Every structure is written in structure tokens, then in C-alpha cells.
Amino acid sequence: MAYPMQLGFQDATSPIMEELLHFHDHTLMIVFLISSLVLYIISLMLTTKLTHTSTMDAQEVETVWTILPAVILIMIALPSLRILYMMDEINNPSLTVKTMGHQWYWSYEYTDYEDLSFDSYMIPTSELKPGELRLLEVDNRVVLPMEMTIRVLVSSEDVLHSWAVPSLGLKTDAIPGRLNQTTLMSSRPGLYYGQCSEICGSNHSFMPIVLELVPLKHFEKWSASML
């Protein structure tokens, strides 16, 4: 989860988020090198007389500044496309969870079970217990098995919402009349917090998401107790 004054990303807990962090570092290095080169050229122009105001044609230079940006864009596009295909590919999910956005709460349905569904509301600040987080705790957590591929179907009952859990690299729009899907797999157990990431009305800030990733045996006990 995020902490006050945090400047970087949350710790990655899924393969997709790890890939996104690597891509961020890769792209940031390219941006840093380009910015350094531009600042160096500007400083040379301001501090030396190495300027060519009368030059009308320089095919070599034009060739360089045409080919070099194209190469840089390819270096950014290829890993980006790879991650996009990884995020869209869902092969043989072990579990499917349907998520519906409402004003202003989430409802969940485990479609592999006959009657396992519930609503998830934010716990008001006045009812929080010591150690719980303001605006992030819910009355019903989404319990899921770790180290298993899980398909999440996302839609909405009313307006646009967005189901997002940053540490898992998840952000899927909830659109009325449309069913979007994403996949998640956690590499370790724990509580993972998220929030609605699409402005959806006056209580948009009060739609937290809490995923509780547990070993498979614990998930089976929980699901049996909910049926």
C-alpha cells in the first residue's frame, strides 16, 4: 500500500506489476538521456559561438534526427506492446470473480460457486478499530487464493467506475452495459488496497477495494463458510 510522502510505486506483488516497473525504469532512462542531451546542446549554444545561423541545408543532420527518434520510439514501443499482450492474455483461469460498481460501493460474485456473492462498503471513520486505515477499510474483503490465475470481470450498474489495485498492476474501467476483464495473480499473501479511479459522483472517494490473498487451503475454508 502507499505511504505518506511516498514518491515511487507501491511494491510489486504480481508478475504484471513487476513488468510495469521494469518498463517504467527503461522508459525513464531514455527520457533522462534525451533531456540531458537537449540541455547540453542548449548550454553549448548559450556559452559558445558554435552556431550556424546561415546554414540552409544539412542532409546528414536531417537524416540523423529522423532516424534516431524512430529508433527511440521502437525501443519504447516493443516492450510496451509485450506488456499489453501479457495483460490481455488469460489462459485457463482457476477462478472467476465478477465485480460490479455502484454509487458508491462494490459488489462481488464468485461465478464458480452457486451462491457466493456480497456487497463491499467502506467502513466509516467512526467505526474503525485501532490500526485500521481511514477511507481504505471495507466491511467485506475479497478473499482470493494466491499463486493462482484469477479472472476478474468488471462492469457497472449505474455510472462509470474504475476498479484499481496499484500493487497488483490492476486498473480496469467499469462501464455500464459492457463487461471488461482482467487477470491477477499474487506472488505472496497479504492485504492489497485500491480505490475507484474514475470520478463517479459525490462519494467517489469512499469506494475502497480490499483484496485478501491467502493460501488455497484458507480460501477453501473461507468459501465453505460463506456458502
UniProtKB/Swiss-Prot annotation:
It catalyses: 4 Fe(II)-[cytochrome c] + O2 + 8 H(+)(in) = 4 Fe(III)-[cytochrome c] + 2 H2O + 4 H(+)(out). Its main location: mitochondrion. The chain crosses the membrane at residues 15-45, 60-87. Residues 1-14, 88-227 are mitochondrial intermembrane. It is an enzyme of class 7 (translocase). Pfam families: COX2, COX2_TM. One of its GO terms (molecular function) is copper ion binding. Cu cation A2 binds at C196, E198, C200, H204. Belongs to the cytochrome c oxidase subunit 2 family. Component of the cytochrome c oxidase, the last enzyme in the mitochondrial electron transport chain which drives oxidative phosphorylation. The respiratory chain contains 3 multisubunit complexes succinate dehydrogenase (complex II, CII), ubiquinol-cytochrome c oxidoreductase (cytochrome b-c1 complex, complex III, CIII) and cytochrome c oxidase (complex IV, CIV), that cooperate to transfer electrons derived from NADH and succinate to molecular oxygen, creating an electrochemical gradient over the inner membrane that drives transmembrane transport and the ATP synthase. This is Cytochrome c oxidase subunit 2. It comes from Tragelaphus imberbis (Lesser kudu). The lineage of its organism: Eukaryota, Metazoa, Chordata, Craniata, Vertebrata. The gene is MT-CO2.
